[in-house]
Design a protein with these regions (language model features):
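Short beta-strand segments
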Residues: 9-10, 123-125, 150-153, 187, ...
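A structural signal for short hydrophobic beta-strand segments in well-ordered beta-sheet cores
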Residues: 25, 163-166, 248
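Conserved core of the sugar-phosphate nucleotidyltransferase
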Residues: 67, 131-226, 233
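Left-handed beta-helix
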Residues: 227-351
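Residues that scaffold the ATP/ADP-binding catalytic core of kinase and kinase-like folds
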Residues: 16, 186, 217, 260, ...
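Conserved N-terminal catalytic core of the sugar/cofactor nucleotidyltransferase
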Residues: 1-5, 9, 13, 27, ...
Length: 351
């Protein structure tokens, strides 16, 4: 059985969002980015995950507007509240304050005193909301005794830390289940050579590492880099220097590990999420969507046979459609069950 401690990095101020709302609380499909990540982490404990997890807890490292973040995730206040809190209701949440933002290595180190050496640590980013439980499960299963990291190959890798592998980059495989070549280090963009900057495989920020080793590596970090920060990624090279090898899994869909730093990236993630939801409804439930690109699901939708949804329909909360339901264009439907053979005309607002 696996004892898993998840560390979620949620301390970033997010200045590029130009917002009074903490970055990690900006919504994707009506749900804060942080909540999406917590839902994915909590799902690892379910029977459907395939992981034999004996114990799971989540450590949220917060900094900027910490009380606002805690209140929203705890479900104790206002506009960002929602039924999604039930996703992690039975998982211990532990809040860790990072008073100064001194880098990702420093952020993770704040949480480690509350994690036993025998645990496996899964590190997630609160501004990477599309990560799926299935990918996290594969990452955990593929980890060597020294750990694993999640990577992605990008045509334009500017701004990301480049992954250095044994034997170079010529044998990169894109199939997440088949990538097993070992990693020697990660070099951040600002510290990379010109040759390293040409590499296309980058670090997603998601890692799975043994707690005891992680504590040892973090104690040896320094700030000898352009940013003057403690880089969590330096642990990869430290492991390699000790003769330990980390595996790396390369995801096939870059959107799954897309980070959000500004409103344009938030909009990209929103559309990617909606496309994923629409495809699932069409393939798994047989829903007909007049235009999958003009449909928004901000909650859950269950449909019967032969249902049709026209363009620019917004579904909020928990909605069920009986058999043969037809929804006209420009409708909003919230927390509603619609009986079989019903027809909803254009511009209806149903709550």
């Amino acid at each position: 059985p696996l004892a898993l401690s998840v560390i979620v990095l949620a301390a970033s101020e997010g200045k590029r969002m130009r917002s009074a709302i903490p970055k990690v609380l900006h919504p994707v499909a009506g749900k804060p980015m942080l909540a999406h990540v917590l839902t994915a982490a909590a799902a690892l404990k379910s029977a459907a995950s395939g992981l034999a997890i004996d114990y799971l807890d989540i450590h949220i490292v917060y900094g900027h507007a910490g009380e606002q973040v805690r209140a929203a995730v705890g479900g104790t206040v206002g506009v960002l509240d929602g039924s999604w809190h039930a996703d992690w209701a039975d998982i211990p949440l532990k809040w860790v304050h990072q008073a100064e933002q001194l880098g990702t290595g420093h952020a993770v180190a704040q949480a480690l005193p509350g994690i036993p050496d025998t645990h496996t640590v899964l590190i997630l980013c609160a501004d990477v909301p599309l990560i799926t439980p299935a990918t996290l499960e594969r990452l955990i299963n593929a980890a060597t005794p020294s750990g694993a990291l999640l990577t992605v190959s990008l045509e334009n890798p500017h701004g990301y830390g480049r992954v250095l592998r044994e034997g170079g980059q010529d044998d990169i495989q894109d199939d997440i289940q088949d990538t097993h070549s070992l990693v020697t280090g990660i070099v951040e963009e600002r510290d990379a050579t010109e040759a390293q900057r040409r590499l296309k495989e980058v670090n997603s920020g998601v890692m799975c590492l043994p707690a005891a080793s992680l504590k040892r590596w973090l104690s040896g970090l320094n700030t000898n880099n352009v940013q003057g920060e403690y880089y969590l990624t330096d642990c990869v090279a430290m492991a390699h220097q000790e003769g330990q090898s980390l595996s790396a899994l390369c995801v096939t869909d870059p959107a799954e590990v897309q980070g959000v730093n500004d409103r344009a990236q938030l909009a990209f993630v929103e559309r990617a999420y909606q496309a994923r939801q629409a495809e699932g409804l069409m393939r798994e439930q047989g829903l007909t969507l007049a235009d999958p690109g003009r449909f928004d699901l901000r909650g859950s939708l269950r449909v019967g046979q032969d249902c049709f949804v026209d363009v620019d329909v917004i579904i909020e909360g928990d909605v069920t459609l009986g058999d043969g339901v037809r929804i006209g264009p420009f409708c909003r439907i919230q927390d509603t069950h619609i009986e079989s053979a019903s027809q909803v005309h254009a511009h209806c607002d149903i709550q």
